[in-house]
């Protein structure tokens, strides 16, 4: 039984439509190279809430909350070829998407 190579790509952004769009674009590129692909798998959305005082001196009870959510997607590529890796390296992702690649 041969050992299978795996590449895991995690996409993270504050805009869910941007993550979905680029996940589909990565999948289209990988499908052209005949590699096996799983995904995009939606990972749990993390919500961050920050509470700040409205006034710098008085009114401790008067506060304002700011929140944002970070959306994540996971794409797994099984048995990638050198052509697959070359095509992934040529992709130019926007600045709003954070990419983490593990093999």
Curated annotation (Swiss-Prot):
State any GO BP term from the record. Answer: translation
Superkingdom classification of source: Bacteria
- Give the molecular function GO annotations: structural constituent of ribosome; tRNA binding
* SMART domains membership: Ribosomal_S10 (SM01403)
Q: Does the keyword Lipid biosynthesis apply?
A: no
Q: Which UniProt keywords apply?
A: Ribonucleoprotein, Ribosomal protein
* CC per GO annotation: ribonucleoprotein complex; ribosome
Q: Which Pfam families match?
A: Ribosomal_S10
Is Ribonucleoprotein one of the keywords? yes
Alphabetized SUPFAM superfamilies for the sequence = Ribosomal protein S10 (SSF54999)
Q: Which Gene3D superfamilies match?
A: Ribosomal protein S10 domain
Query: Mind telling me which PANTHER family this protein's record contains?
Result: 30S RIBOSOMAL PROTEIN S10 FAMILY MEMBER
Entry similarity comment: Belongs to the universal ribosomal protein uS10 family.
What does the UniProt function comment say about this protein?
Involved in the binding of tRNA to the ribosomes.
The record describes its quaternary structure and partners as:
Part of the 30S ribosomal subunit.
Q: What is this protein called?
A: Small ribosomal subunit protein uS10
Which species?
Answer: Chlorobium luteolum (strain DSM 273 / BCRC 81028 / 2530)
Q: Which gene encodes it?
A: rpsJ
């Amino acid at each position: 039984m041969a050992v299978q190579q795996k590449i895991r790509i995690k996409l993270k952004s504050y805009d869910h439509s941007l993550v979905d769009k680029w996940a589909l674009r990565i999948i289209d590129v990988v499908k052209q190279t005949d590699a096996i692909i799983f995904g995009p798998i939606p990972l749990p959305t993390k919500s961050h809430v920050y509470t700040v005082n409205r006034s710098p001196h008085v009114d401790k009870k008067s506060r304002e909350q700011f929140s944002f959510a970070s959306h994540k997607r996971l794409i797994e590529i099984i048995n990638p070829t050198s052509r697959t890796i070359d095509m992934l390296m040529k992709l130019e992702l926007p600045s709003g998407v954070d990419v983490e690649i593990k093999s």
